[in-house]
């Protein structure tokens, strides 16, 4: 159970750093007018919290234990819908930058760099924590479906903490709902793909395009609106497949337990 304590403690400490950092920024009124100062502050907080996760990984984990095992290339077909969403978003985003780059000042360019760094660090950290450390630890100890549910809910509930970053309660709840849809789709994807790298890349690029385009006033493809419906469809299909496979697995001490053969058969 020690590894489970480590993963849970790591998530809690990560979140506490983010919350305390956001509260400090709010107390100094950093988030009110100066957007660049806000981005710099957020980047520092993110670097500290993610630096802690890197420390934990180096001390306690191997890459395969946090979701970076050999990817199942034949299962990438399940990830294709997300690629179809990302490509037009990325195209419109790059097109918008190209058309407006002559109007960008140094502040905007620095902001883009900070947003990119922040979204890369946050995207990979969140995937490693919930679809890497927590999911991989739990699925070896409890019912696989229970492990998936805990990982999904943990990821979504974590986003309520955005209220400490200046979001209203309604905005935070909307964020939780959107994160829930993504979480319940990405957990079975992580299991089927046997690797979280595609998920972390999508997570990073999605956040970067959404945040950067809003900051720069660039219109992106409306195809992003299909993400939630796709999350729902992928969730229903993959959860159904895994649950059916789980029912066929073996019982041990009257409790259905995780089986490598089960995962490999999906």
Task: Write out the residue ranges for each language-model feature.
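Juxtamembrane helix-loop-helix connectors linking adjacent transmembrane helices
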Residues: 30-40, 61-128, 135, 140, ...
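Aromatic-anchored segments of alpha-helical transmembrane domains
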Residues: 15-24, 85-93, 152-161, 204-214
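Functionally important transmembrane alpha-helices
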Residues: 171-229
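C-terminal membrane module of polytopic membrane proteins
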Residues: 204-266
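Membrane-interface helix/loop boundary segments of multi-pass membrane proteins
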Residues: 12, 125-152, 191-195
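Structural signal for the C-terminal ends of transmembrane alpha-helices
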Residues: 55-63, 91-94, 237-247
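Hydrophobic alpha-helical transmembrane segments
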Residues: 8-12, 77-79, 112-113, 145-150, ...
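Alpha-helical transmembrane segments in multi-pass membrane proteins
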Residues: 10-59, 74-79, 113-114, 118, ...
